[in-house]
Amino acid sequence: MSKTPLLDTIRTPEDLRKLRVDQVQQVADELRQETIDAVSVTGGHFGAGLGVVELTTAIHYVFDTPRDRLIWDVGHQAYPHKILTGRRDRIRTLRTAGGLSGFTKRTESDYDPFGAAHSSTSISAGLGMAVARDLAGGNNNVIAVIGDGSISAGMAYEAMNNAGAMNSRLIVILNDNNMSIAPPVGAMSAYLSRLYSGKTYRSLREAGKQIGKHLPKLIADRAARAEEYSRGFMMGGGTLFEELGFYYVGPIDGHNLDHLLPILQNVRDAETGPFLIHVVTQKGKGYAPAEAASDKYHAVVKFDIATGTQAKAKSNAPSYQNVFGQSLVKEAAKDDKIVGITAAMPSGTGIDIFEKAFPARTFDVGIAEQHAVTFAAGLATEGYKPFCAIYSTFLQRAYDQVVHDVALQSLPVRFAIDRAGLVGADGATHAGSFDNAYLGCLPNMVIMAASDEAELVHMVATQVAINDRPSALRYPRGEGRGVEMPDVGVPLEIGKGRVIRQGNKVALLSFGTRLAECEKAAEELAALGLSTTVADARFMKPLDVDLVLKLANEHEILITIEEGSIGGFGTHVMQTLAEHGKLDGEVKMRAMVLPDVFLDHDTPTAMYANAGLDAKAIVKKVFEALGKEHKAETVKLA
């Protein structure tokens, strides 16, 4: 017998809306069980999705999706949404090759009107859709669901300020799962929320505003303040949103459908706006291990449902994130000017390790990358040595601050760029594909990439020693190569690479962790009679010009390999060769970069193979440069 008999009857939200209201809770219960079962098989973001099961069910029951546009901020909580919107039969393909995305994706379903994975974009996108609807004379609803973490970012407030000024008929649902804004909610709060979301209250309030326009200013201002005070006293938490021009409704229990459904129905039928509905939920709701340790179940690998034990593979190599955190701790023990900064990703970047050792010198600024960079710049002006640890994909959000506030002033901010290159299951939205290109064009910037975890230790020490300009150190997600680790980091000579293996026919110049693939390719090429040099550039800027020219002069073929897009390391090498006349027929130069597409999720190994950046692809590129076909030449040499 099925564990989800009612959910089995639902293919789309239209099927859900045919059910009686007293059946909706059973759907939510079954939806939660299906979400738990699916994620236990695939892994993925977990706690946030469990927290919005009732909210997801209620929204699709009340609103006419996809005609009514539903936007999930970040999108990592959208697994229940995907199950209800025609994708249940593929839910166990989440984050695998050819399977469902771990986030909302426009090309995946009409029920995903806006793709997401980075935070705080939903209200801006929703306002754009609402304005487009009004311009076209439509009457559909637009709903943006945003978390209490995401709403802390400046972009969300910019959008709310704009929406309030326009009196747009937009619905924003604040999913507060940290209890960070409001106290626990109760029956009186639910009653008042229902009252304030209703048509009678809104009509009276609008009438009061119109009357106020004809009263003397002093009296009108006092009346408005009294009204705001009374709402704040009774409701709590809404004054800020009211000041931005929103009707504030809440806080309400996001797991109580008896509260959620009537309020959503009232707001759905409203002719004015915008609304902010404050819903309080619990991360991991309905699964005891996740409720007890929400941080450990934010994102999970495959796990045992009965115990909650996650099936993490053992490794002999440390993760790059841990190596960075531990290296920074060692450096900070010798230098009290070192501080660590993260934008809401302490465990993802290794800053949590630093925080345990130096809590007073650790700053988590929240989802505020722009602020993080300029905050670091301010610290640098006062002689401190800020390490701003941030994912490559999120540093994009603070590019003007990097340019204007850091590079232009040559301030020694140290950027520790995590998740450089392809990241696997999180796919294109989280790939660190572009930082080589967008940082490499900036004056005053030192840019280096670790080829393994031991090099990372030395590069952290190198950044500590750079006090006259900004520096960027990039390294990938995941585990290192298992190399021998140094006891302490030793600063490297700026702008100097190293030769790993000497040959005379082919030169492979790597920037980053593709070095291991270069070494594999060199072995295969040597077996085929092609003597191959392997070099580790270490620095993209300043580039080791002497090394580049030496490789070009002493080899027939020079190939660069990097985990980044066009416009990065290979482009800089080509520019150098062109300036020295080395591309005038003297050397066959090829730059291996990520393809000019957004690569979908898969394992990192498969993604790099598909991108043409593994050892096999390197060997193939060498034969292409020679003007020979690899398979035929292999047979000939054999």
From Swiss-Prot:
| Record has Magnesium as a keyword | yes
Q: What class of enzyme is it?
A: transferase
Entry binding sites for thiamine diphosphate: H76, A117, H118, S119, G149, S150, N177, Y287, E369
Q: Which cofactors must be present for this protein to function?
A: Mg(2+); thiamine diphosphate
Q: Which GO terms describe its biological process?
A: 1-deoxy-D-xylulose 5-phosphate biosynthetic process; glyceraldehyde-3-phosphate metabolic process; terpenoid biosynthetic process; thiamine biosynthetic process
Copy the pathway line from the protein's UniProt record.
Metabolic intermediate biosynthesis; 1-deoxy-D-xylulose 5-phosphate biosynthesis; 1-deoxy-D-xylulose 5-phosphate from D-glyceraldehyde 3-phosphate and pyruvate: step 1/1
Q: Which SMART domains match?
A: Transket_pyr
Q: Keyword set for this entry?
A: Isoprene biosynthesis, Magnesium, Metal-binding, Thiamine biosynthesis, Thiamine pyrophosphate, Transferase
Q: Which reaction does it catalyse?
A: D-glyceraldehyde 3-phosphate + pyruvate + H(+) = 1-deoxy-D-xylulose 5-phosphate + CO2
- Binding-site list for Mg(2+): D148, N177
Cofactor remark from the record: Binds 1 Mg(2+) ion per subunit.
Q: Which GO terms describe its molecular function?
A: 1-deoxy-D-xylulose-5-phosphate synthase activity; magnesium ion binding; thiamine pyrophosphate binding
Keyword Transmembrane: yes or no? Answer: no
Cite the record's note on assembly: Homodimer.
* Reported function: Catalyzes the acyloin condensation reaction between C atoms 2 and 3 of pyruvate and glyceraldehyde 3-phosphate to yield 1-deoxy-D-xylulose-5-phosphate (DXP).
- HAMAP family referenced in this protein's UniProt entry, alphabetically: DXP_synth
Q: What is this protein called?
A: 1-deoxy-D-xylulose-5-phosphate synthase
Which species does this protein come from?
Rhodopseudomonas palustris (strain BisB5)
Organism lineage string: Bacteria, Pseudomonadati, Pseudomonadota, Alphaproteobacteria, Hyphomicrobiales
